[in-house]
């Protein structure tokens, strides 16, 4: 199971939001590139980047910083937030990004996502952000009626590289990852699932490890790393010991 540190970008800074609320922002670093290097030096084998400004604007807002991070870390990087057209995907892949995460578009513009999967096989990740099981879009500001499970199943056999399942109600709250919701999703689809949202302690990772066989391939950790509740080296060691 791969441990993936999260770097959320807003206004050129590394931040964390509480439950996706743009009014509840904590700035953890004014230098996201240095932050990315620090996680790499501590053993990160993959990084999860989110362009929060882009998720609201509908197009990239922190591309220069993302490019610098990709060039400086030397490990695979995934990026989400504001990716709404093929040219943006091409731009990110050209700068060395390994995977693009499509969230809002997965619900609102399926033909675009299908096209992206055809053009860039293995480079598209489905980002499913859910609140009480229902998918949220547009930077989590809009709630839909479709369930996370329904959305994931609808993208089977499309060449999706992975599904990142984020429980918004837990994100940034350090209340513990939604193990059951993630397990149900992983068992329902034949796509690797990455858990996200609410990871608080090493115990969360311990609870996810037995579910690798169910298809949970990784876990994204944000606030718990920045607050010091989890040491990245310990998390990686634990994940590799399984």
Curated annotation (Swiss-Prot):
E.C. no? 5.3.1.16
Main subcellular location of this protein, as a coarse class: cytoplasm
Q: Which domain of life is it from?
A: Bacteria
Which molecular-function annotations from GO does this UniProt entry contain?
A: 1-(5-phosphoribosyl)-5-[(5-phosphoribosylamino)methylideneamino]imidazole-4-carboxamide isomerase activity
**Where in the cell?**
Cytoplasm
Catalytic residue positions = 8 (proton acceptor), 129 (proton donor)
Pfam families linked to this entry:
His_biosynth (PF00977)
Q: Name one GO cellular component term.
A: cytoplasm
Q: Which reaction does it catalyse?
A: 1-(5-phospho-beta-D-ribosyl)-5-[(5-phospho-beta-D-ribosylamino)methylideneamino]imidazole-4-carboxamide = 5-[(5-phospho-1-deoxy-D-ribulos-1-ylimino)methylamino]-1-(5-phospho-beta-D-ribosyl)imidazole-4-carboxamide
Q: In which pathway does it act?
A: Amino-acid biosynthesis; L-histidine biosynthesis; L-histidine from 5-phospho-alpha-D-ribose 1-diphosphate: step 4/9
Q: Name one GO biological process term.
A: L-histidine biosynthetic process
Q: Which UniProt keywords apply?
A: Amino-acid biosynthesis, Cytoplasm, Histidine biosynthesis, Isomerase
InterPro entries reported for this sequence: Aldolase_TIM, His_biosynth, HisA_bact_arch, Isoase_HisA-like, Isoase_HisA-like_bact, RibuloseP-bd_barrel
Family assignment from sequence similarity: Belongs to the HisA/HisF family.
Name this protein carries in UniProt: 1-(5-phosphoribosyl)-5-[(5-phosphoribosylamino)methylideneamino] imidazole-4-carboxamide isomerase
> What is the scientific name of the source organism?
Syntrophus aciditrophicus (strain SB)
Q: Which gene encodes it?
A: hisA
